[in-house]
Amino acid sequence: MNPLTRVALAVAAFAALVLALSACGPAHVAGHVPKRRDYAVPDAAGQEAQVASAGSTWREGRAASMLYTDARALRENDLVVVRIEEIADAKRSADTDLTRRSELNASIEAFLTSLDTPYALKGGATTGFKGLGSTARTERLTATVPAVVRKVLPNGNLFIEGHRVVLVNAEEQHFYISGVVRPIDIDQENGVKSSMVADAEIEFTGRGVLSDNQRQGWLSRLLGWFWPF
């Protein structure tokens, strides 16, 4: 086998290995580690889980117990759909107008009687300041993210956490939400609004070509940090 053939076979084997490894999992723009939030109950004092007595005819988890109930998330590892719709509209304005004026008149004719020309001292000062500023910001985020019940709290509320990754044309978008919901706020379609999620953490980030182009270069950031004007 000549050396050229060996090189060709080595390149082909390497390409096959790369394709096999790339097919083993989803292709991310960069290394991705899903976020996991370690949620702790703020104050569990006085909150005790409701446990049925041993002789109760109603036992949670039995097949018969689901005959007359809906399929909403109630236990750990159950799924619930979170409909994110966050709207933030903030406006602020400030107007300041300050004026200060002082005037001083003093005559010294009584001390200089031998002179016909009167002498007087006059002085005055005026200062003023006027400032006007305003700011406005509007944000809207709409998405649907399936979440998993990570923990059932002692009072029956559910701690949920969900991720969603969307890859389109080398642009990767990450959705994340976590928080506490009440089972009563979950509708018949097993969904809940983000406005009903307490202690919520909602993140929407992107990685890829578009996100890189929207970010200022490191040299521009360095010059902006040094430039005083």
UniProtKB/Swiss-Prot annotation:
Q: Which residues form the signal peptide?
A: 1-23
Matches recorded under Pfam families: FlgH
Give me the residues lipidated as S-diacylglycerol cysteine.
24
Q: What does this protein do?
A: Assembles around the rod to form the L-ring and probably protects the motor/basal body from shearing forces during rotation.
Name of this protein: Flagellar L-ring protein
- Xref: InterPro entries: Flag_Lring (IPR000527)
PROSITE patterns found in the cross-reference section: PROKAR_LIPOPROTEIN
Taxonomic classification: Bacteria, Pseudomonadati, Myxococcota, Myxococcia, Myxococcales
Membrane protein topology class? Lipid-anchor
Per the record, its GO cellular-component terms are:
bacterial-type flagellum basal body, distal rod, L ring; cell outer membrane
Q: Lipidation, kind N-palmitoyl cysteine: residue numbers?
A: 24
Say which family it is in: Belongs to the FlgH family.
The record lists the organism as Anaeromyxobacter dehalogenans (strain 2CP-1 / ATCC BAA-258)
